[in-house]
Amino acid sequence: MRILVVEDDRLLNNTLCYNLNTAGYTVDSALTKSVASSFLTKQDYDLIVLDVNLPDGNGFDFCREIKERRPDTVIIFLTANDMESDMLKGYELGAED
């Protein structure tokens, strides 16, 4: 399984990637939407772990873009926000969690 982690907090990004690699997954890491976009032009991913707030874009908008090109890609949002409206918006955009 190939996973893309898109999280701008470097420590959290590194921790997620380390744990996923240790569990046997192939993982690519992006700190920004633009870097993640470049990965997506070269590689298909089984799972994308996506931050809602990125320095160069909105995770919800990016999710919409990804789902338009690759509707079968599983997306899990990662955020410190605990607002139910954010959770519902993610589900409406096709995120799994």
Show where each model-derived region lies:
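N-terminal/domain-start alpha-helical segments
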Residues: 1-97
